[in-house]
Amino acid sequence: MGVNAVHWFRKGLRLHDNPALRECIQGADTVRCVYILDPWFAGSSNVGINRWRFLLQCLEDLDANLRKLNSRLFVIRGQPADVFPRLFKEWNIAKLSIEYDSEPFGKERDAAIKKLASEAGVEVIVRISHTLYDLDKIIELNGGQPPLTYKRFQTLISRMEPLEMPVETITPEVMKKCTTPVSDDHDEKYGVPSLEELGFDTDGLPSAVWPGGETEALTRLERHLERKAWVANFERPRMNANSLLASPTGLSPYLRFGCLSCRLFYFKLTDLYKKVKKNSSPPLSLYGQLLWREFFYTAATNNPRFDKMEGNPICVQIPWDKNPEALAKWAEGRTGFPWIDAIMTQLRQEGWIHHLARHAVACFLTRGDLWISWEEGMKVFEELLLDADWSVNAGSWMWLSCSSFFQQFFHCYCPVGFGRRTDPNGDYIRRYLPVLRGFPAKYIYDPWNAPESIQKAAKCIIGVNYPKPMVNHAEASRLNIERMKQIYQQLSRYRGLGLLATVPSNPNGNGNGGLMGYSPGESISGCGSTGGAQLGAGDGHSVVQSCALGDSHTGTSGVQQQGYCQASSILHYAHGDNQQSHLLQAGRTALGTGISAGKRPNPEEETQSVGPKVQRQSTN
């Protein structure tokens, strides 16, 4: 009897640089490539139509490429734990290959399948190819803890063995005598389903801005490397109006689904740099997008609560407001701030927004204006973003909300000034918010300030055709900076933490706070006269600090107060490469100095202002 093998695709939807599939084929007489449509997809069933379409296009492209090898993709619906015992028997399987999944829910799922395979006498092949490095080795090198500063992470990877080269693409020569049994009714049994078959209404669905699949990914990679201006200098391009639109060289969704190998991208960048720079060694900053991705993967791999505030050992427990109405306005692009609303509209329509646009809307939702938990924003991104990745998405939201990977909280993106500096003419606003198309550039970012005559000429009356701003940004950001400052001051009382290394006496002053990001940010200007704190241009490489608080409790005023649980674990990761952690035994302590009494701002609004009144909190 021959050796029958199965390769299970999850991420890694490609034939290039697929070491698990390549090893599976070696010594096998038959191989079947399967994809299981299951509730574990992306760690959540909260997936929008654009993401489902991208996935199905990836599967169709994979099936087309397998056909060139006289093979096919077998798409099977169900739970892996139910599907595999049946397949092992029905197909008489001897070995199963998978790409290593570093995320906690993926590791749990794979452990269960390995157990079933062992019981069935099936050999399991697991190979790392979704990340550049073996994340467990990074953690081991750091004394068993994930590095929580980007600088520390860079130090660790510089000590590791050089990366392995990508493995050869699966070709007919690689397949040799290994065949795939395909029945006449394959498409009926195992074909890639349509969106309609999955229950989606596709009436009026515009064509995809980002076509899915390995073929498109490799084409984009070549375009990416050919960009003349970028290749010449290897510098981050400056932010401008065109940066906000989907680029034909964009790669993030393809890296997320594994249509493009991160190792192939890494080595293509390396080769190009050496060719242009005459064999000089490339700096780590060349690989910024890939290394930030790796950094968040490492931070998340052993933390199943990484996407939660409660129970997450690296997340500050901040008493965010619960405000479903305000959350819905933000998610649906109805905040009354054209810059924020245009970004959220683009996200919902196309499934992608520029990483600095992500920062702007994340800041607005959390510490900037609405004081709503980063978890809520993360869920919206998880639904709508094509490149939403469990580790990177959660890590990025924690960072920008100042809940972890500490950023200077007194920097705040202005929902008027930031957009105006990026796209002074407002073309981006007109593209995604056609209701505002008639406004002149002077008023398109703050149309509520336009005289009535201009609003009438634009055929858009603010408060009728387009909403009034839901908050007064200058007041809301000032109040929220103060709230965050007091939370961190409370933490800093436990000396040795040094969490407020640089809290300015003037929180509206300039500074060089790093920009949170999956991809280091371009040089930008922040808010000035339009209200809110100024944002210094940064490269995304600032020292990252993190700490964990204990439980919250409610004080006598009815306002949730921040406290420490008995024997709470507070972690501190010091500046630079020297990383230390301290276990502090602290009694229950409420937040010390309270926030000045007063209402949340309520400027020119038709609805109630966001959040409850903030009452003075007493010292315990």
From Swiss-Prot:
Q: Where is this motif: LIR 4?
A: 255-260
Keyword set, alphabetical order: Biological rhythms, Chromophore, Cytoplasm, FAD, Flavoprotein, Nucleotide-binding, Nucleus, Photoreceptor protein, Receptor, Repressor, Sensory transduction, Transcription, Transcription regulation
Q: Name one GO molecular function term.
A: photoreceptor activity
Q: Which cellular compartments is it found in?
A: Cytoplasm; Nucleus
Residue numbers covered by motif LIR 5 = 271-276
Its required cofactor(s), as named, are: FAD; (6R)-5,10-methylene-5,6,7,8-tetrahydrofolate
Q: List the expressing tissues.
A: Expressed in the retina. High levels found in ganglion cells of the retina.
Motif, LIR 12: chain positions: 486-491
Residue ranges of the TM segments: none
For this chain the motif LIR 1 maps to 50-54
Residue interval(s) of motif LIR 13:
492-497
Q: Which GO terms describe its cellular component?
A: cytosol; nucleus; photoreceptor disc membrane; photoreceptor outer segment membrane
Q: Where is this motif: LIR 2?
A: 82-87
The subunit field of the Swiss-Prot or TrEMBL record says: Component of the circadian core oscillator, which includes the CRY proteins, CLOCK or NPAS2, BMAL1 or BMAL2, CSNK1E, and the PER proteins.
Q: Tell me which family the UniProt entry assigns to this protein.
A: Belongs to the DNA photolyase class-1 family.
Tell me what this protein is called. Cryptochrome-1
| Source organism | Sylvia borin
Q: Identify the gene encoding this protein.
A: CRY1
